[in-house]
Amino acid sequence: MDNKLLLEATNTYGSPIYLYDLEKIKSQLIKFKESFRSIGDIKVQYAAKALSNISILKFIKNLGCGLDAVSIQEIQIGLKAGFKAKEIIYTPNGVSIEEIKEAVKLGVKINLDSIESIKEFSKNFPSDSIFIRINPNIFDGGNDKTSVGHSESKFGIPMDQVDILVEMEKANKIKIDGIHVHSGSDISNIDSFIKGAKTVFNLAFKFKNIKYIDLGGGFKVPYFKGDTHTDMNKLGNKIGIEFNNFKEEYNKDIRLIFEPGKYLVSEAGVFLTKVNYVKEGAKNKFAQINSGFNHFIRPAFYNSFHEIENISNPRAKKEKYSVVGYICENDTFAENRKISKINKGDILCFKNAGAYGFSMSSNYNSRYTPAEVCIFNNEFKLIRKSQEINDLLTNQIIIDL
């Protein structure tokens, strides 16, 4: 998306806004599938948590993907977007049996990650088969908050508890037809993926009727020129060798599943904001924008780096700025970053904002969530309106005091 197009979007819809390029999502999916060509027909379950706008989900569904959902609400939105229940895998963590029952009623595939929840599930649904999520004891990922496959993580069934499930299956107390592993986000080390895959392949021999192996997601995309990222072709070749050897030995038809989220949508999205003031501080020069971590929390929460470009004045000499928001605490997006000279009213573009941007936004400070816009067939499409005051008050009740 060129700067002229981005500026046109802010002229039409105002700012701040999230803007998504649907063709980029499509091209990322094609690249992803091509990386695993040695395996054949892989199953792609898009991770809805990355970006769950219903129009984006509909587009991804039309590309032939299934859906990875982590909440009953993601399931419901997915169904409204057009996914069939059988195309959705539900992978909750620590939810109540009531929510799981609701998911079963909707007809989606259940993937559970604790002995406790599996035992309760088997009492209620003894004839239903499930996936199980394993904790492979792998510590990797771009941030401690997103590393979810290590021994101290709340996610997944520890390896030393797997035999409990083997005995449950032998006693016909549970039916297991899929094994799932997901170690984290922003993993560039291919060996971590291979270790997770080998762990699951070896576990499959303990069970009688495995039909699916789900290797999750977590593929790292580059955030700036020269940044590390997952070498997808290299990973695909290595996974292909391991999987084809495993399938030959297992001697049953097994389908491989992946759950890309960020890989598909991160680079397809930008976040556009306007500069309210350029403030001279005691030591720093601040670019104060009309947004905060209520809209885009990744830099504050994950300490993530996002390129920031002044698209109103891209060829100007670069100066150092700390880009900050309007929230009542230190919501710093970038500190002493070299950016083309910034003036009041300029539009700043945050790159790689398609994943975990809007989906992690909030109404902190009673601020409105921003609009979402996509580009489809060379046209802008508004896919979410910015909030208004009534949106903040809709579910509140004023009582007599």
Where do the protein language model's features map onto the residues?
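Active-site-proximal loop/turn and secondary-structure-junction residues that shape catalytic pockets
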Residues: 48-52, 73-74, 94-96, 114-116, ...
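General structural feature for long, well-ordered alpha-helical segments within catalytic domains
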Residues: 5, 21-24, 28, 32, ...
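Conserved, mostly hydrophobic/aromatic
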Residues: 25, 49, 71, 103, ...
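Charged (often Lys/Glu-rich) extended helix/loop segments that serve as interaction or gating elements
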Residues: 3, 253-401
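Glycine-rich, aromatic-flanked loop segments that form ligand/cofactor-binding clefts
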Residues: 127-139
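Active-site loop/helix belt of alpha/beta enzymes
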Residues: 136-277, 339
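Structured core elements
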Residues: 66, 89, 111, 131-133, ...
